[in-house]
Amino acid sequence: MIFKGDSVRLQCHFKTFSGVSINPDNVELVIYDKAKNIIETIPITDENKTATGQYYYDYVVPDDIDEYFIFEYRGIHNTKPILAREKVNIKFN
């Protein structure tokens, strides 16, 4: 469980359908609230890459988010969208 106001490392690993790690173009991290409204869009660079296809971002959970948020890593591979999405539960205490 993650606390409001705390930092959380959001990670993803992009792979092809055959399981090969890939580096998509134009990688972004999108944060959604529980109503699926976009809170923030963050460009992801090579500084956020740990290995082929593996990315992270240290995100500070805003105090005004209730219950959970959803994060989505997205990019373009071979002219097609590729994405990974996950829900993060949060609490105040």
Question: Where do the language-model regions lie?
Answer:
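Contiguous segments within soluble domain cores/interaction surfaces
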Residues: 1-93
